[in-house]
Amino acid sequence: MVEFRKTIPILRIFDVAKAKEFYAGFLGFAVDWEHHFEDNTPAYLQVSRAGLTLHLSEHHGDACPGSTVFVWMTGIEEFQREISGRGYQYLRPGIEATFYDARCVQVIDPFGNRIRFNEDLKAAPAT
């Protein structure tokens, strides 16, 4: 029997410090690990939060900048309040209604990658 367990998107980055500021400092992800083949070589790292895992790579062939990741989640209002309260100077995302009956918080990282965090209105408890 075929079973797909988990998808981990790989996003292209160009600066580890900026990536950590955005993913850990702004979005609240944990940096699980960081790998370099040698000193002064490109980084490959894993960040995660609440069941979502992302790989971030400075390696040229791993991914294209400007990718989009679509994420289903719950607690979108709390998430939006939390990240907006951090005062990240480059982004202040709101919650948008979508045509597919969801609420979406879209963020764009310093490298042009988009993450669309979505909460299904049909599955979300009434507020």
Which residues does each PLM region occupy?
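Conserved beta-strand in the GNAT
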Residues: H55-S57, Q106, R116
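N-terminal beta-strand motif that seeds the catalytic metal site of vicinal oxygen chelate
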Residues: M1-K20, D32, S67-V69, E119-T127
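Active-site beta-strand termini and strand-to-loop segments that position acidic
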Residues: V47-A50, V107-P110, D120
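Short, charged/polar surface micro-motifs in flexible loops or helix N-caps
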Residues: A50-L54, G61-A63, G75-E78
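Core segments of cupin and vicinal oxygen chelate
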Residues: I10-T53
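Short acidic/glycine-enriched loop/turn segments that link adjacent beta-strands
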Residues: E38-A43, A63-P65, T98-R103
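Vicinal oxygen chelate
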Residues: F14-A17, V69-R114
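A short acidic/small-residue loop/turn micro-motif
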Residues: G61-D62, T98-F99, D120-A124
